[in-house]
Regions:
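Thiol-/selenol-based redox modules, centered on thioredoxin-like
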Residues: 141-202
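Loop/turn elements at helix/coil->beta-strand transitions in domains of secreted/extracellular proteins
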Residues: 52-54, 82-87, 114-118, 136
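Structural microenvironment flanking redox-active thiols in thiol-disulfide oxidoreductases
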Residues: 68-112, 123-129
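Short active-site neighborhood of thiol/selenol oxidoreductases, capturing the structured segment around
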Residues: 45-68, 176
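Bacterial Sec-dependent N-terminal signal peptides
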Residues: 1-23
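Short, thiol/selenol-centered motifs that function as redox-active sites or metal-ligating centers
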Residues: 61-70, 139, 195-198, 202
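Short, internal strand/loop/helix patches
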Residues: 107-151
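N-terminal "domain-start" segment that seeds a small globular fold
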Residues: 19-47
Length: 202
């Protein structure tokens, strides 16, 4: 009985999280830039990366078990694609609703896990809402054209959220590799598996 209630609670949480984000990007949409505070105290925007051909934007956090399970894979993605598709992590969790996700906690977490990429705080949650992010982690791969940034992939990192050794489909890597090669992305959208973003008005 307790297991059934727990599963029902998780389902309700996901439903509520999704209902709080009524808009958001779809594949093919134009993504707008943002300027958010990084863990080093500086403001970061996509425009800062003049040589980037695109971006791997990941809405993430410190506390979700799925985010923790993906941590090593996220660091690896950054190392693999930093030259032309830099990774940008964004924490949109309300620190009032999610203990352990304050800005100070982010600084400590990034240092502990040797982050070599920006880890930005979306204090107003406006960027998460604009993108339509619902879970952590939730990935948006952006492709830079001559005039703007196009959303090329939305979803999960791979097909094994809890166990890196069981991965058979690497959706983000496949998407970026396709963009690099000028080829269509085979799977441009998947379901983001993770914890619901903790909204201020939840």
């Amino acid at each position: 009985m307790k297991i059934v209630n727990f599963v029902s609670l998780i389902g309700l949480t996901i439903l509520i999280a999704g209902s709080l984000v009524k808009n958001g990007y779809e594949v093919g949409d134009t993504a707008t830039d943002f300027k958010l505070k990084n863990i080093d105290g500086k403001l970061v925007s996509l425009a800062d990366f003049k040589e980037a051909k695109g971006f791997i934007v990941i809405f993430d956090c410190n506390t979700c078990p799925y985010s923790k399970a993906y941590n090593g894979r996220i660091v690896a993605l950054s190392k693999k694609y930093s030259k032309d598709f830099p990774l940008i992590a964004i924490n949109a969790n309300s620190n009032e609703e999610s203990q352990g996700d304050s800005y100070e906690d982010m600084v400590k977490y990034a240092k502990k896990h040797n982050y070599d990429f920006p880890y930005l705080v979306d204090a107003t949650q406006e960027i998460a809402r604009a993108y339509g992010a619902t879970n952590t982690p939730h990935v948006f791969v952006l492709n830079r054209t001559h005039t703007d940034l196009k959303v090329a992939y939305i979803g999960t990192i791979d097909d094994s959220p809890r166990n890196a050794s069981s991965v058979t489909k690497r959706y983000v890597e496949d998407a970026v590799d396709a963009l690099r090669a000028g080829k269509p992305i085979t799977t441009p959208k998947t379901k983001a598996i993770g914890c619901g973003i903790r909204w201020k008005d939840a």
